[in-house]
Amino acid sequence: MQADMHGKLHAALEDGFFLFPFEQQQQPNIYYDTTTDQEDRPCFSFGSTISPRSWHFEKSDKIASSQLQNLVHTQPIHLINPQILFNEEFLNLENIDSQPISKETKTTKDCTMATGPERGKKSSESTRSSSLSSLFSNDESASTFHSSFNNHDNFQKSNRNGDDIDISDTIKYETNTNAQKDIKIFQENFEFNEFPYTQDFYPYTTNYTYSKPTNIHESINSKNTDSYSQYQDQFPPHTDNIHSFNNRHYSNHKSTNCNYYNNTSNNNNASDNVYEADPFIDEPQVPSYYYPLEIAFDVEKSPPPSLQKLNSKELEFLKKLNSKLSRYAAAYSFSSSNDQDYYDKVRFQEISYKFSKTYS
């Protein structure tokens, strides 16, 4: 069946054989004049009747090719369902509005009972959507193309210029794709802070302690920080910016000499502090090279639990367990089985079950 379809497709493309009965019958020796009015030339559409205006294909001055060629060369090939191309209903779309519905009605004497939805009067838009959904095997793609057609139709009716295109009109008819659903689920499951770096990097339970620098003489007391200034160089090393991490957390240590390097005699406009005041933190800024910063986290350390003395049954169980584990390890080392992950899971479940039964 599939080979026959491919054969028909190749025959239609190479020999120019027309598979659609309602397409324009061209004579082999007659060439259409380019000056002919395009409105008189029927063109392909996914609709019921041969419309002078096609919503999908642009009009061309070239010789009109077969409708199957237009279909194959303008549609993504992976979206075309080959089983629908030669469907009887799809081949007779031009008569779908005028044909009687024999399959969906039952005539009994003088009355007619309809067993399905009425199809006698259908707009071109609904017919296009039905044929479009049957043409494409992917329902989501069909709905997207149908939405694009609605958007295009509304734009044509509004008679607006090309410069007046509103982006909202394009987005309004778009369907929800799987990617949009995944993004919505991602936003629901993971709630991120809008400003992740507004707070300090470390939690508030962090302790900030000072240690004695290694280059300080032993006779100098680390508490008397003013006496340490004579051991500093005249030009201090590079100091961090006022917004850096080290300079933001000296609020509880105000005994450090911050004004040593202020030469107020030469500069009368010098500020009281070496650093400018931080507008967000009302605390003195201290050079970070005085004392290196050591960060010690407050981890709640619970006392180690008392060791439980095992009875004879538990000791026997541990011996058997160790023997099993050693046997598993030996088997893995010799066999190098590809199912090691599976046996690891089984072994973990077995150990967990036995421990839960033993220590519950």
UniProtKB/Swiss-Prot annotation:
GO terms for biological process: meiotic cell cycle; positive regulation of transcription by RNA polymerase II; pseudohyphal growth; regulation of meiotic nuclear division; regulation of sporulation resulting in formation of a cellular spore; regulation of transcription by RNA polymerase II; sporulation; sporulation resulting in formation of a cellular spore. Residues 102-135 are annotated as: Disordered. Residues 126-135 have a biased composition (Low complexity). One of its GO terms (cellular component) is transcription regulator complex. Keywords: Activator, Meiosis, Nucleus, Repressor, Sporulation, Transcription, Transcription regulation. Transmembrane segments: none annotated. It comes from the Eukaryota. It is found in: Nucleus. Induction: Starvation of yeast cells may stimulate activity of IME1 through a post-translational mechanism. Its main location: nucleus. Transcription factor required for sporulation and for early sporulation-specific genes expression. Positive regulator of SME1/IME2 expression. Directly activates expression of SLZ1 during meiosis. Interacts with UME6. This is Meiosis-inducing protein 1. It comes from Saccharomyces cerevisiae (strain ATCC 204508 / S288c). The lineage of its organism: Eukaryota, Fungi, Dikarya, Ascomycota, Saccharomycotina. The gene is IME1.
